């Protein structure tokens, strides 16, 4: 088999969606001396199959996050999940956790031509919710979330819980002009 990157290296690869993750993995493999790389699409399908079999076991819940989403819904606020993760994996994870009804809608990888940090996914969610950018808030945990919000013209509130391609989110946010960063 292929060499396995250390966990810290994998953490630095995460943050741009699964396709970007695989691109970064391929670059790492090349740097590790791997001469023949596997087919991209078959690698993607294998990774998705492995993740599907794990049932989200490695995804950690941020304490209070789902209760917060529930409170927003009970207050009549439309809550959409916008993720660069694959739709099938996301829907399965939400169903298995019994939280699929928490969200009014989902915009996932493949739903738009350009994933975050492009604004397309957020614009699709806002439009689908029948809202305006001025009424929306993006709560995210990565630079891609923040940049997508900025590009879509909406407020970004960031939490320090996610992977941010190897750079602490608070540090990155300060240099990029994002001031609303909260501990997870």
For the regions a protein language model found, what residue spans apply to each?
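Acidic, Mg2+-coordinating phosphoryl-transfer loop and its flanking beta/alpha structural elements
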Residues: 126, 137-183
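Active-site neighborhood of HAD-like aspartate-dependent phosphohydrolases
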Residues: 1-12, 165
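Metal-dependent phosphoesterase signature
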Residues: 23-67
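A short, structured active-site edge motif that brings together acidic residues
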Residues: 7-13, 38-41, 99-114
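Conserved H-loop
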Residues: 3, 99-104, 132-133, 179
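Short loop-to-alpha-helix "cap/lid" segments that border enzyme active sites
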Residues: 116-128
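Short, acidic loop-to-helix structural element flanking the phosphoryl-transfer center
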Residues: 53-81, 87, 91, 119
């Amino acid at each position: 088999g292929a060499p396995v990157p250390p966990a810290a290296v994998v953490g630095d690869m995460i943050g741009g969606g699964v396709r970007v993750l695989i691109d970064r993995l391929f670059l790492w493999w090349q740097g590790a001396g791997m001469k023949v790389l596997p087919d991209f699409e078959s690698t993607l399908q294998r990774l998705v199959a492995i993740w599907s079999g794990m049932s989200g076991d490695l995804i950690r819940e941020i304490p209070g996050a789902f209760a917060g989403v529930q409170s927003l819904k009970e207050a009549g606020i439309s809550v959409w999940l916008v993720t660069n993760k694959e739709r099938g994996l996301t829907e399965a994870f939400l169903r298995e956790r019994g939280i699929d009804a928490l969200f009014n809608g989902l915009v996932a990888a493949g739903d738009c031509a350009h994933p975050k940090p492009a604004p397309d996914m957020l614009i699709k969610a806002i439009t689908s919710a029948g809202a305006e950018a001025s009424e929306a808030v993006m709560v995210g945990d990565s630079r891609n979330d923040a940049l997508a919000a900025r590009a879509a013209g909406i407020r970004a509130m960031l939490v320090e819980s996610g992977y941010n391609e190897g750079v602490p989110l608070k540090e990155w946010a300060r240099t990029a002009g994002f001031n609303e960063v909260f501990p997870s």
